[in-house]
Amino acid sequence: MGDQVLGAHFLEDALKLFRDYKKLAEGAFAQVDDHDLFRAIDDESNTIAVNMKHMAGNMLSRWTDFLTSDGEKANRERDMEFVMLPETTRADMVEFWERGWRCLFAAVEPLTADDLMRIVKIRGQDHTVVQAINRQIAHYAYHVGQIVYLAKHFKSSRWQTLSVPKNRSAEFNKFLEEKVKSGTSAAAGRFDVGQEFAAKNRK
């Protein structure tokens, strides 16, 4: 396998991961009402809205002029990403969330295999493009996990699972095996098959 093929595969998979985590977070925060979107479980915890705000702020800093400027922008106010103004609405948060993701995809989608070993800086430290992308995938997965956990906590028994339901692994494996045999699983997102199985069993 040549470097070009490997590089193209990496970028394709990275974009897929970004889209999958975006969709997972949205499936979680769509289930909570406005009160729970802005509610913290204790004084040290972030709310769902704060996680959204921080992720979007990070994206706007990291991915604006990705190849040509430091990923930690001088005009970024990181500490304010963890402060929620009283007048902030769900619509405000969703708009900012989408703005961050648009910035990310605008930066990553044009990349080619030839870009992957280029050097970019984050807080003055050198990263290859591969390292910078992997760093952000890990960071966003961390915060998406918090969003899912909080939404699940608030919804409790009314939570509609976004993965394989508890005590249904054997059934899910059979369901997935049948999808693989039929050739319909390959195009699904990383979390889509589990959600499809859960939805099928709610009917």
Task: Give, region by region, the residue ranges found by the protein language model.
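Extreme N-terminal tail/first-helix region
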Residues: 1-16
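Long, charge-rich low-complexity segments
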Residues: 99-116, 183-203
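Hydrophobic alpha-helical core bundles mediating ligand binding, dimerization, or RNAP-core interactions
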Residues: 18, 22, 29, 97, ...
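Short amphipathic alpha-helical segments with heptad-repeat character
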Residues: 12-15, 19, 91-94, 98, ...
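Acidic-glycine-rich active-site phosphate/pyrophosphate-binding loop
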Residues: 30, 114-121
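Helix-adjacent hinge/juxtasegments
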Residues: 65, 70-107
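Short, contiguous alpha-helical
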Residues: 15-19, 26, 34-81, 122-185, ...
